[in-house]
């Protein structure tokens, strides 16, 4: 743990360390006193050896919590985190899902779900963190966004002595694992298990209902200028496949590749699903209507799913997935009728 912050925990391991430290201090005092009172050299040597061995033992820190993060780093805590800062809106949601919401002391802008998150102190944007504010909040754990937070900022947090755990679910089925690991760090495992069970049950149901249906070529549009889609390594690709769709840009490894209108026309999606950056259907989605040769235009399959239900890798992704699956079902019905 960082020397910056003094723990007031009643954790048994912490109490043991404090007791051990007091014992070391007492032993050292006895040695000093024995020297002043001219006690035998052999006795002083034995006491010195005891002090050396005890010091060596206490220096071998034993951590009660050890969890691997998404970069393979072993994050160690000597007790469950009590003051957590989240560096991404999606991570804030995951922490609440893990039952650790009441341990959050700071979040970044746009951390708006659940409602309680809106009342938490803001420590900047995900890409522009206020280091001074973070230090003032004295976190014992900072949860960082692997591909979103600037690497220099994450490194700086570590240099300042903070414990940083890096996370980002990249697959739909990995969300339960992320929730479970965060719960382990926060000591909220029992609260998290109910959320995990509900998620896994819903995921199985959606998979059974949609994955084996007639494939629908699908173009997922994140933004219009530049034209951005989702590649094969993005969690959104998992959702498209879950719904029985085929991501027309699944062959691109980038998470959010820039694509051209020409490439979309060539791949001729049967459905276009947009999210944009707001809760309202983006006006630019209708710009595809001028391309009458598109199958998606012929079947009126220009759909919208709110971005927070797909672009945040949290349990709510299944709400967005259900909406997408129902939309692709509409396209299937229209293709059959045509």
Indicate residue ranges for each PLM-predicted region:
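Bacterial N-terminal signal peptides that target proteins for export
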Residues: 13-16, 20-23, 27-51
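Extracytoplasmic substrate-binding proteins
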Residues: 65-67, 73-74, 140-141, 151-228, ...
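Short helix-initiation/N-cap motifs at beta->coil->alpha
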Residues: 68-72, 123-132, 252-261
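A short, structured surface patch at a secondary-structure boundary
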Residues: 83-137, 141-147, 248
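Short secondary-structure boundary segments
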Residues: 88, 146-147, 222, 252, ...
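His/Asp/Glu-enriched short active-site or ligand-binding loop at hydrolase and phosphoryl-transfer sites
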Residues: 108, 233-256, 276, 303-304
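Short helices/loops that flank or line small-molecule/ion binding pockets
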Residues: 131-138, 160, 259-268
